[in-house]
Amino acid sequence: MANETLEDAVLASETLALAVELLKRRSVTPDDAGCHDLIAARLQALGFHIERHRHNDVDNLWARRGTASPVVCFAGHTDVVPPGPLEQWLSDPFEPTLRDGKLYARGAADMKTSDAAFVTATERFLARRPDHPGSIAFLLTSDEEGPATDGTVRVVEALKARGELLDYCIVGEPTSAAEFGDTIKNGRRGSLSGTLRVKGVQGHIAYPHLAKNPIHLAAPAIAELAETMWDEGNSYFPPTTWQISNIHAGTGVTNVIPGMVEIQFNFRFSTASTAEGLMDAVNEILDSHGLDYEIDWNLSGKPFLTPRGALCDRLSEAVHEVTGLTPELSTTGGTSDGRFIADICREVVEFGPLNMSIHKLNEHVALENVEQLAAVYEKALEKLLGESDERV
């Protein structure tokens, strides 16, 4: 495999061939760079109804084949983060390169290989089961790595408005940690950010009695916030955390007491808490310290959880049959578009390649994992939509 050329590998793998075509496209957020066109053409040939949902500079693709339940949806993104310093890459990040059994390119792991595997898995399943029960859907966006305000959330809003709900959704995020197939994400913590401004009175630093230092005033409250146990978590989630990300105050000189301090912070919270409850608790602590303050809140995602059930179990079986591993269910990590999809889908999980190189220089995916990933997705379709006596 180490001496295999990319051309030879592409001939041997339909999934790799499509992944390479996607990876050649410089689809840095929010530019889709034609990735949706490639995928839509393949899906249209399979009988999918295609919808384009463009909002501002963001391209979104919704595709569905069938009208019955259950609905199994593959969800993902075609945008990638910027490559960073090109001179520090061993090869052009938008010219896929095979080296030592690994495919190198920006988006190889996060998550164009998953996008390609979605398509080829569906093609193979439909070749065997054209009259399968239920429906298959795709939800793709070019705005997952950016603000995520015009991407998946907009398509979800449109589907919800017309009463179109999903039963199962597999998001192709790179979830594998140490080896391919070791982790399925069956939930994510919520993310609640706040910008706190504590007001004081500006003055000369030599005359503190004529001023009120907002940093000093806020310090005891900050200490209490940092020490507060917000909840104990639960069997799926660790306890909620509160962390300061930035503190800004002062004029840049050493002889002026600032008139205000701005503190930016973030909660990563579990299903054991609510955003409203956390906001109320913060206000209560700040009020108890007698501060003159204001807060701007931003809830970028609620927590979601898919307990063990049909989707977790069937996908775990598929992973085990392909890799021999029994994946761990995990809710660790940051947010994903699963937080939006959970609003219209009763079971949402994430599964994809190794995540060790994502957003890094020389991002890559192991060549052997490319077809393994497609096989897992195909088996998942079979288990969720196929007959029990006919397995992949």
From Swiss-Prot:
Purpose: Catalyzes the hydrolysis of N-succinyl-L,L-diaminopimelic acid (SDAP), forming succinate and LL-2,6-diaminopimelate (DAP), an intermediate involved in the bacterial biosynthesis of lysine and meso-diaminopimelic acid, an essential component of bacterial cell walls.
Protein name: Succinyl-diaminopimelate desuccinylase
Residue numbers annotated as active site: D79, E144 (proton acceptor)
Cofactor: Zn(2+); Co(2+)
Gene from which this protein is expressed: dapE
Residues involved in Zn(2+) 2 binding: D110, E145, H359
A Pfam match: M20_dimer
Pathway(s) this gene product operates in, as recorded in its UniProt entry: Amino-acid biosynthesis; L-lysine biosynthesis via DAP pathway; LL-2,6-diaminopimelate from (S)-tetrahydrodipicolinate (succinylase route): step 3/3
Protein family membership: Belongs to the peptidase M20A family. DapE subfamily.
Single Gene Ontology BP annotation: lysine biosynthetic process via diaminopimelate
